Amino acid sequence: MIKRILAVLVLVSVILIPGCTKDKYSGEFKNDKEVAEYVDTIINKKYSRYFDAKLCCSDYGTNDEGVFYATVYVKDEKYEFGVEYNIKNKTLESDASKGYHYEKLLEDIRNTIPDTMRYDVQSVKCNKRKGFIKDYHKFVSDKDTKIELMLYFDGSMSDDDAKQVQRVMKSLSDKGFNGTVQCCNGEYYSDVLKLGSIPDIKDIEKCDNE
């Protein structure tokens, strides 16, 4: 009976005593806002010289594992990058290179695609990393940097159109780009075509509605 009472008291103590429960902030912070202010300090020391602007965490939160995540918007949301801070391990991971190179990347794609073609850069993906890739060409050719590109055509697609898609894909690949290209005529879509490959014209023309 005494043992049972002691066991109950120990259980109550674990519940009530501060620090005995799992704390996603590891006792370092009180809330997400405090973490955000701390991470703001870190990212400004690391990256502000590259962006020439004060960097602030937005859309942030902390998961149950104690990993704080946020999006950093740069130049009035012209581009952005993500950060993750592990509160317990005190480690920061970021894809800041994405934001740093994003504007130039879009310009590079725009200069590669003929003016006669309509397109949309649907996404630029970059795995979060501790390192910062300052060299643009190293960033583009990095295996973690991937683009998703959509090319638009009106109505029927000719063989010449399909060959133009092949040329665009080769040009992007020659520049070091990784990722995928897909064609759309407004209703139908081609296969998802991987950069670095030479797709068959028939696979490209699957977006044809005739």
State each model region's role.
Residues 12-13:
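Repetitive helical segments and hydrophobic/amphipathic motifs
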Residues 21-25, 87-91, 143-155:
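Acidic/histidine-rich, surface-exposed loop or edge segments in extracytoplasmic proteins
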Residues 1-5, 9:
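Positively charged n-region of N-terminal signal peptides that target proteins for export
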Residues 51-85:
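Exposed beta-strand-loop-beta-strand "reactive/processing" segments of non-cytosolic proteins
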Residues 79-100:
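A short, surface-exposed beta-strand/turn
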